[in-house]
Curated annotation (Swiss-Prot):
GO terms for molecular function: signaling receptor binding. PROSITE patterns: IG_LIKE. It holds the Pfam family C2-set_3. One of its GO terms (cellular component) is external side of plasma membrane. The keyword Zinc-finger does not apply. GO terms for biological process: regulation of cytokine production; T cell receptor signaling pathway. It comes from the Eukaryota. It is a single-pass type I membrane protein. Disulfide bonds join C54-C128. Residues 276-291 are cytoplasmic. Glycans are attached at N59. This is Putative butyrophilin-like protein 10 pseudogene. Coiled coil: none annotated.
Length: 291
């Protein structure tokens, strides 16, 4: 039995196939939603926690979607969540045991991962992906880590002609600002060295100055972060009494040559006057004897 083909049906099939081939492949995978992240970087304190939050638009439920947070460069999984369950298989060891999925608002299209015990290595850009079948949307979340470190300490040591004050601190991130002032509020120039740990990337600070001004009663050391300009840690130190005594001794040492020169001039002048008067007396005596 011969199979016949309706020419009109064949043309219809060809037309539909042609239209389908004309469609961009990207439109097949394009999601019916957008994913948005924070508009500004998120500030996280070293040792604290940070929340990586992303939002669906429109506000549809994400309960049945695959949700993934990962480091954009390179692509390392921070946390994965799918259909109400955490998927730990692809999570990198750096994040195991310190991420928590917050499911409070997933039904309204808002999802968040909380990362605990923040370190300097969390200072980077992250990506969040919401995937529904073969369709997905992505957004980025930038995290900036800040740390003021330990309280600064000032160590004062006597020098031959002054005093040396060194301010030290550790655990700062990123590079900190160091400011040295005296108790009158006057800035004091100092030599500051900053060094970063190869293992923690935290910065250590050592700022030293030598003070020659005997009128200064004490010094302060202020450390602040460029990410937290309104917050700072300050240490103050009164100069020891030995510095004032050594300062007085140094002042006497500086004045002693002048005093000796002045005394020498006075003595020399006195001797000159004495010999001049003695000569005049001797001359007068000789003239009287001649008369």
């Amino acid at each position: 039995m011969a199979v016949t083909c309706d020419p009109e049906a064949f043309l219809s099939i060809c037309f539909v196939t042609l239209v389908f081939l004309q469609l961009p492949l990207a439109s097949i995978w394009k999601a019916d939603f957008d994913v948005t992240g924070p508009h500004a970087p998120i500030l996280a304190m070293a040792g604290g926690h940070v929340e990586l939050q992303c939002q669906l638009f429109p506000n549809i439920s994400a309960e049945d979607m695959e949700l993934r947070w990962y480091r954009c460069q390179p692509s390392l999984a921070v946390h994965m969540h799918e259909r109400g369950m955490d998927m730990d298989g692809e999570q990198k060891w750096q994040y195991r045991g310190r991420t928590t999925f917050m499911s409070d608002h997933v039904a309204r299209g808002k999802a968040m991962v909380r990362s605990h015990r923040v370190t300097t290595f969390d200072n980077r850009t992250y990506c969040c992906r919401f995937k529904d079948g073969v369709k997905f949307g992505e957004a980025t979340v930038q995290v900036q880590v800040a740390g003021l470190g330990r309280e600064p300490r000032i160590q004062v040591t006597d020098q031959q002609d002054g005093v040396r004050a060194e301010c030290t601190s550790a655990g700062c991130f990123p590079k900190s600002w160091v400011e040295r002032r005296d108790f009158r509020g006057q800035a004091r120039p100092a030599v500051t060295n900053l060094s970063a740990s190869a293992t923690t990337r935290l910065w250590a600070v050592a700022s030293s100055l030598t003070l020659w001004d005997r009128a200064v009663e004490g010094l302060s050391c202020s450390i602040s972060s460029p990410l937290l300009p309104e917050r700072r840690k300050v240490a103050e130190s009164h100069l020891p009494a030995t510095f004032s005594r050594s300062s007085q001794f140094t002042a006497w040492k500086a004045a002693l040559p002048l005093i000796l020169v002045a005394m020498g001039l006075v003595i020399a002048g006195g001797i000159c006057i004495f010999w001049k008067r003695q000569r005049e007396k001797n001359k007068a005596s000789l003239e009287e004897e001649r008369e």
